[in-house]
Curated annotation (Swiss-Prot):
Protein's name in the database: 6,7-dimethyl-8-ribityllumazine synthase
Pathway annotation: Cofactor biosynthesis; riboflavin biosynthesis; riboflavin from 2-hydroxy-3-oxobutyl phosphate and 5-amino-6-(D-ribitylamino)uracil: step 1/2
UniProt entry tagged with the keyword Transferase: yes
NCBIfam families: lumazine-synth, PRK00061.1-4
GO biological process: riboflavin biosynthetic process
EC numbers for this chain: 2.5.1.78
GO (cellular component) term, any one: cytosol
PANTHER family membership: 6,7-DIMETHYL-8-RIBITYLLUMAZINE SYNTHASE (PTHR21058:SF0), 6,7-DIMETHYL-8-RIBITYLLUMAZINE SYNTHASE DMRL SYNTHASE LUMAZINE SYNTHASE (PTHR21058)
Length: 155
């Protein structure tokens, strides 16, 4: 019979880093509220949660890398990149996505992608707690599950 390994949705005993982009703060603050709500509902100690605000999404991967190196069980990355009239959206969204994945792979720490990439403000608002749930909440749930899975795998 195979040995099944799964992470539980439990925040107790875990330390979380959260990186939040200040750009589009009217969206990202809702993502942060969602992430904190999920962690709180699942028993995370508020004193074991550190939040780093960064100017924009492009600064998220480097800050996540610094957090991953400091002993967090998981790092949650939150931001909102909204398409405009120039190709800036594609550049930022692609590089931030690659950067977050690279930090996770290089550090061995779950670094969770909780960014909204949207065509317009309405889509971003929907994904930050209205019609389409809250991507910050979802990212925190993933962070807890992955951190606990890694603890199971380390046994």
């Amino acid at each position: 019979m195979p040995n099944i390994m799964e992470g539980q949705l439990e925040g107790r005993g875990l330390k979380f880093g959260i990186v939040v982009s200040r750009f589009n703060e009217f969206i990202t603050s809702r993502l942060l509220d969602g992430a904190l709500d999920a962690l709180n509902r699942h028993g995370a100690d508020p004193g074991a949660i550190d939040i780093a605000w960064v100017p924009g999404a492009f600064e998220i991967p480097l800050t996540a890398q610094k957090m991953a190196a400091r002993g967090y069980d998981a790092v949650i990355c939150l931001g909102a990149v909204i398409r405009g009239a120039t190709p800036h959206f594609e550049y930022v969204a692609a590089e931030v996505t690659k950067g977050i994945a690279q930090v996770s792979l290089n550090s061995g720490v779950p670094v969770i992608y909780g960014l909204i990439t949207a065509d317009n403000i309405e889509q971003a608002i929907e994904r930050a707690g209205t019609k389409a749930g809250n991507k910050g909440f979802d990212a925190a749930m993933t962070a807890m599950e992955m951190a606990n899975l890694f603890k199971v795998m380390a046994r």
